[in-house]
């Protein structure tokens, strides 16, 4: 796929995901938690789309290495977030 085609497809997909998030927020009667979950899902999909379509993550000689670095960074970030939440919940429950 050519670069112009990749950028066009990525741009249109980003707009569609954004409009879907706006639609879910404004025009559905879902609960706040459901809306938030859907919006975060769209956000993660759009972030992956940005990395693949615009940042050319998998292209070139170092494509696999770059992909591994991004996955490693996401795992470390997830460990920090989940670990912090776990410690904060544990500290909160021991003081009650």
UniProtKB/Swiss-Prot annotation:
Q: Main location per UniProt?
A: membrane
**InterPro entries found in the cross-reference section:** Cyt_c_oxidase_su4_prok, Cytochrome_c_oxidase_bac_sub4, QoxD
What's the EC number here? 1.10.3.-
Query: What subcellular locations does the record give?
Result: Cell membrane
* Membrane topology, from the record: Multi-pass membrane protein
Function comment: Catalyzes quinol oxidation with the concomitant reduction of oxygen to water.
Q: What is this protein called?
A: Probable quinol oxidase subunit 4
Q: Which organism is it from?
A: Staphylococcus aureus (strain MRSA252)
Q: What is the lineage of its organism?
A: Bacteria, Bacillati, Bacillota, Bacilli, Bacillales
